[in-house]
């Protein structure tokens, strides 16, 4: 069960090892972003990789309906979900009825720690990248900033200067950073 923000990357990090281990995989992308995973699965099928028909399946549609069906199905031996806490709770509850193993990554946020001896220009670049990459829509976004009081004001100034250099606009436009 794959989220919308990095649908292909997050799907493949679970699909590849499962296929390598000889497992059949049913992938369910977020209903907002199914195309990249569908295109990848089609490319795998057309490339004649030797993967037997039906070993890799992509199911699209309502997350609640399909996720619930997969989590409770007796033929499902394991579930990997990257998503929100409410979805994780629902999948875990349904899967627990059959004792199906579940691996959850539920959208935690990372922290940046900045100490007094830090290079503040480098720290500002890292902070901006960590929180604003992909518009901050990442489970590991550095959305918490813990800064020693001795460098707080200087770091804020450096962050403002750094983010001021970032072109803002439509995501597919040339040179846009945010």
Predicted features and spans:
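ALDH superfamily catalytic-core signature
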Residues: 78, 86-178
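Rossmann-like NAD(P) dinucleotide-binding subdomain of oxidoreductase/dehydrogenase enzymes
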Residues: 1-122
């Amino acid at each position: 069960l794959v989220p919308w923000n990095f649908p292909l990357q997050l799907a493949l990090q679970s699909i590849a090892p499962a296929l390598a281990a000889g497992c059949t995989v049913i992938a369910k992308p977020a209903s907002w972003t199914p195309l990249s995973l569908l295109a990848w699965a089609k490319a795998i099928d057309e490339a004649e990789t030797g993967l037997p028909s039906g070993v890799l399946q992509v199911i699209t549609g309502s997350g609640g309906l399909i996720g619930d069906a997969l989590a409770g199905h007796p033929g499902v031996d394991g579930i990997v979900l990257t998503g929100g806490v409410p979805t994780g709770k629902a999948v875990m509850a349904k899967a627990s009825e059959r004792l199906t193993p579940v691996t959850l990554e539920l959208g935690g946020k990372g922290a940046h720690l900045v100490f007094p001896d830090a290079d503040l220009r480098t720290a500002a670049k890292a902070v901006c990248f960590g929180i604003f990459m992909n518009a901050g829509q990442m489970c590991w976004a550095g959305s918490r900033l813990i800064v020693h009081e001795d460098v707080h004001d200087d770091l804020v100034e450096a962050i403002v200067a750094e983010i001021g250099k970032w072109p803002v606009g439509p995501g597919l436009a040339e040179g846009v950073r945010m």
